[in-house]
Amino acid sequence: MEDAAAPGRTEGVLERQGAPPAAGQGGALVELTPTPGGLALVSPYHTHRAGDPLDLVALAEQVQKADEFIRANATNKLTVIAEQIQHLQEQARKVLEDAHRDANLHHVACNIVKKPGNIYYLYKRESGQQYFSIISPKEWGTSCPHDFLGAYKLQHDLSWTPYEDIEKQDAKISMMDTLLSQSVALPPCTEPNFQGLTH
């Protein structure tokens, strides 16, 4: 109790031991005070004594290592976000390209009413005019009068699918239809089912 009443003795201890005010490299020590919160400490010596200098070095290394880990974690997360942004940009570019192609195909000359689900064949005249026909190059044979540019299937959302992608697109649509039918289907009985809860 005599130590608590003699703050000067505490200052002497601090001066003799030469406690540094703060640790370097970003680390900082807690401020030293003999009366924290206005209350005198029982033993200021045991609470304010200077530690091993190696402890201060370890503290600074720990702070530096924490900074490195935080920076590495932030970099990893930003890398994932950047990859997602790049993927979304590619998807957006493809959506715009498909929309531009579909709009152009809808403006191609055609003497028949186009119906979703059918395949139409795109030809080009010598004059440069493009037109749709329901006659395929195979049906024309060697007597095809114009250049064949490609075949497209008109989907029910009025988008166009190139002939080489029809099978893959139909598989996607079939899978989506299956998922929608399963999610919309309701169970035959709407009453509570207690089967298995009682013997």
Swiss-Prot record:
<protein>
    <recommendedName>
        <fullName>Uncharacterized protein C1orf50</fullName>
    </recommendedName>
</protein>
<dbReference type="Pfam" id="PF10504">
    <property type="entry name" value="DUF2452"/>
</dbReference>
<dbReference type="InterPro" id="IPR019534">
    <property type="entry name" value="DUF2452"/>
</dbReference>
<dbReference type="GO" id="GO:0042802">
    <property type="term" value="F:identical protein binding"/>
</dbReference>
<feature type="coiled-coil region">
    <location>
        <begin position="71"/>
        <end position="101"/>
    </location>
</feature>
<keyword id="KW-0175">Coiled coil</keyword>
<feature type="region of interest" description="Disordered">
    <location>
        <begin position="1"/>
        <end position="30"/>
    </location>
</feature>
